[in-house]
Amino acid sequence: MMLNEPLRICGTEVKNRIVVPPMSDFGTVAPDGLVHQSHIDRYEAYAKGGAGLVIVEACSVLRMPENRDTLCLENDDCIPGMKRLTDVIHRYSAVALVQIMLTGLSTMKENRIDEITRTDFLRYKDAFVSAALRCQTAGFDGIELHAAHGMYLDEVIETSERKDEYGGCFENRIRLLAELITEIKKTCGKDFIVAVRFGNPNYEELLKTAGAIQAAGGDLLDVSSGMGRYLDVPSGFPYDGKIYAASLVKAHTKLPVVCVGNIFTGDEGEAILKEGLADMIAVGRGSLADPAWARKTLAGETPNPCLRCKICMWYIYGALCPRRLSK
């Protein structure tokens, strides 16, 4: 069973190919942006549930009014709580990453990327590197840069028209992401995993982004998309469009690729791996409905299935998830 095969990422062995992707529960984040017991309980359930890689939900590198519903890594106050997360994830032999991000400027209702002062632009950049170092201090095996779903790094890559070296042509727009990868590696060491979640509705730029991540020293490609921007998927492709994007990246890179998108059964995940479309599968809603999805799937058991609500109720507020309520 390919799902149960180990995989090495930057020298770290992941015990199987199942990933719990970063998923925020906006009903549990406290105003202080710090880890609380509800987070510990949730991530312990995922790790105990058998996934090889657990990626902690998006954490902001700076505290801003627009990301008040996220965990925050702005200062060292975050380290004790984040250490509690790594402890419970590692307790069950899972690899622990944390997704770090800054909210997109369109969400922040501030100026466009090209209107940010150079001082602020470089301050944001430094905040990512500092956050990565705090995550390493807390015991994480690595970080994931969130460069998808309209977040700040995604906006820079896709829309920056700055007049300096970070805007205009693709080579300039990708520069910030590439420099972040290089600087985080320099700061945290070559064995610290740097993953990137990214996507692009432009086929050529999707592949060029993957190549730039690899060239900069990135270790893992987590392909996703959202905000209504998707690649055109050929008729007859049997899986989600995000998996199609991952398959294109997989065919053009040497780095391991994670795919995500409507993977609800072990048979689906196994088929994706056997067809060579990705190296790992991320199971989001399935893990929300049953945190033991990985363990049960690998044991040949049937997990409690996600009910596939049109709008994910767990995402809105976890206590409202009908699958959780039905237990």
What feature does the model see in each segment?
Residues 1-327:
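Flavin-dependent oxidoreductase catalytic cores
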